[in-house]
């Protein structure tokens, strides 16, 4: 769980070079020849994720990256161990071809559950070709929507935040779970539906369904707590508990338990020199303490 990583190696709503279709220096295959495009472009692509044109269709090619080091998970791993909360324990991203296989499998599973995720068009060892969530039109992540809404005031921010809550609840209502349910990985599509991206790891390989769903809620809160706490923490509680009312008893009990275990984290230092992850953990703990105080 590392929401600090917001670089251009994601599948949708990107800024910079990865947002524009990568130029092809050869004639594109006929529309529908996804496997051929993947075979041709995978060895040429330097970016981890880049978009391409296949006829009139925009597609995304994701190639295997290096195995991710454990250091990036150190803050939450230490906290999870100290609190004895498995739901907070990071699920390491294996990187490489293994992560590609996991992502392809999870995209298919979630798609079959009726959720809006990129369609797997073709795959081979070390590479994956996916559809564009916007079908060629612009998409906006919940992260971007929150940042825009924050400037408009608390009411706008809460509305944007609730969209993310509802999107996660829709996944859970189908008996499913996400992976890294951070605001950057929830994507507003042009038709108004929120889609989901980034499935290089699978918490379900180590945890039960209830724990995976609790991770989704805490991941989203972790990535948004600083904005929410600064704007309207009490009003946000009403949205939070309204959505949680439809969660299973097991999920609600585990969230309340996590809130109690995390209480002391509200006293973590607030200075920026301690890092953004520490600030987010502190903000999350303060919100949960306020929302679940007895």
Describe the function of each predicted region.
Residues 2-48:
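Juxta-kinase regulatory segment immediately upstream of eukaryotic protein kinase catalytic domains
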Residues 48-99:
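ATP-binding glycine-rich loop module of kinase domains
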Residues 66, 135, 194, 201-205:
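Activation segment
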Residues 81-82, 94-100, 108-111, 115-160:
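Conserved structural core of kinase catalytic domains
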Residues 110, 167-171:
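Conserved hydrophobic alpha-helix
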Residues 173-183:
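Catalytic-loop of the protein kinase fold
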Residues 185-196:
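Conserved protein kinase catalytic/activation segment
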Residues 189, 199-294:
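C-lobe/activation-segment region of protein kinase-like
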């Amino acid at each position: 769980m590392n929401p600090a990583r917001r670089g251009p190696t994601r599948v949708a709503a990107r800024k910079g070079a990865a947002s524009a279709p990568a130029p092809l220096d050869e004639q594109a295959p006929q529309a529908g020849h996804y496997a051929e495009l993947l075979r041709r472009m995978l060895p040429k692509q330097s970016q981890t994720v880049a978009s391409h044109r296949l006829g009139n269709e925009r597609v995304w090619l994701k190639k295997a990256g290096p195995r991710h080091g454990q250091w990036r998970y150190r803050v939450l791993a230490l906290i999870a161990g100290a609190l004895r909360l498995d739901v907070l324990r990071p699920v390491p991203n294996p990187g490489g071809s293994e992560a590609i296989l996991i992502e392809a499998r999870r995209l298919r599973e979630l798609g079959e559950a009726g959720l809006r995720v990129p369609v797997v068009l073709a795959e081979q060892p070390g590479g994956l070709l996916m559809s564009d969530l916007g079908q060629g039109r612009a998409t906006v992540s919940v992260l971007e929507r929150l940042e825009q809404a924050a400037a408009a005031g608390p009411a706008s921010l809460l509305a944007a935040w609730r969209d993310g809550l509802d999107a996660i609840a829709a996944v859970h209502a189908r008996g499913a779970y996400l992976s890294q349910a951070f605001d950057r990985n929830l994507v507003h599509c042009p038709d108004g539906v929120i889609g989901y991206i980034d499935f290089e790891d699978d918490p379900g390989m180590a945890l039960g369904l209830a724990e995976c769903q609790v991770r989704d809620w805490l991941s989203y809160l972790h990535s948004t707590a600083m904005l929410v706490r600064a704007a309207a923490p009490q009003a946000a509680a009403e949205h939070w508990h309204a959505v949680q009312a439809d969660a299973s008893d097991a999920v609600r009990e585990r969230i309340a338990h996590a809130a109690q275990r995390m209480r002391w984290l509200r006293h973590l230092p607030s200075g920026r020199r301690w890092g953004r992850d520490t600030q987010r953990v502190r903000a999350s703990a303060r919100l949960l303490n306020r929302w679940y105080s007895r």
